[in-house]
């Protein structure tokens, strides 16, 4: 496929991480949803210090542009569904349970700076050849992965006559222990067999983006299990 065009965002998945950026295995550590408006990933860049060589007569003898420092992405998720499970995984705010043990709400508490989550997204790809693959398939998607997002925090919320949009902010970190991940997100062979990432991100990377023929998971309004990858070896 050449020059893919990105259409609308389809599906998002978040996964709970431990304080070292590793996926937490278990039944209540993932969440998949599609009821959101947008995800912004804004680069956080610190300008480098320029060096100017200036002679006594005022003439500039040389100039070296400072190298900017990329600190990561400032993440902003605008979403609609008030899911206690999603909010608990991304912010650390505890879930409020009903008489039957089902999640019915959440508490807003102190910022859990030691908590973290991974953020994955699938966006539709437009093109004449998105379904023209040897292994068949249902199309193609742009897949992006932020393997370590920290400092999840809910933003302002105003409830009135208009539709209510909630906002989650966070910041990425490099490194971590995502590895090749606990999920099958791309084709592992020419037959289109679903498999995990072929290689992990390097220690200085904050995001990975690629085209995949593996369809996103189905959205469900409840926790989803994290059982693949490192979980299989533990």
What annotation goes with each model-predicted range?
Residues 1-47, 230-232:
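Polar/acidic, low-complexity leader/linker segments enriched in S/T/G and N/D
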Residues 145-234:
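Mixed-charge, glycine-accented linear interaction segment located at domain edges/termini
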Residues 4, 64-65, 156-157:
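Beta-strand-rich interaction surfaces with strong enrichment in secreted/lumenal proteins
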Residues 56-58, 62-87, 162-176:
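Oligomerization/assembly interface segments of phage tail-like spikes and tubes
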Residues 65-125:
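Aromatic- and glycine-enriched beta-alpha-beta binding-site module
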Residues 23-28, 122-138, 182-202:
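Acidic Ser/Thr/Pro-rich low-complexity disordered segments
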Residues 27-69, 85-103:
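Short N-terminal edge-element motif at the start of the domain
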Residues 106-159:
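Short helix-loop boundary/capping segments
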């Amino acid at each position: 496929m050449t020059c893919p065009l990105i259409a609308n965002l389809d599906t998002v998945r978040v996964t709970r991480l431990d304080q070292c950026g590793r996926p937490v295995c278990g039944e209540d550590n993932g969440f998949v949803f599609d009821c959101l408006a947008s995800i912004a990933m804004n680069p956080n860049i610190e300008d480098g210090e320029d060096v100017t060589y200036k002679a006594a007569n005022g003439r500039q003898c040389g100039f070296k542009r400072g190298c900017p420092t990329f600190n990561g992405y400032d993440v902003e998720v605008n979403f609609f569904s008030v899911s206690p499970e999603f909010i608990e995984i991304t912010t650390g705010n505890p879930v409020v349970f009903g008489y039957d043990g089902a999640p019915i709400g959440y508490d807003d508490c102190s910022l859990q700076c030691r908590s973290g989550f991974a953020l994955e997204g699938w966006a539709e790809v437009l093109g004449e050849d998105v379904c023209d693959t040897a292994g068949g398939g249902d199309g193609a998607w742009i897949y992006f992965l932020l393997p370590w997002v920290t400092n999840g925090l809910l933003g302002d919320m105003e409830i009135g006559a208009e539709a209510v949009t909630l906002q989650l902010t966070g910041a990425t970190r490099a490194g971590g222990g995502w590895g090749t991940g606990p999920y099958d997100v791309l084709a592992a062979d020419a037959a289109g067999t679903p498999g995990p990432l072929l290689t992990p991100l390097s220690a200085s990377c904050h995001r990975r983006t690629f085209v995949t023929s593996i369809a996103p998971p189905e959205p469900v309004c409840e926790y989803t299990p994290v059982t693949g990858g490192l979980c299989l070896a533990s």
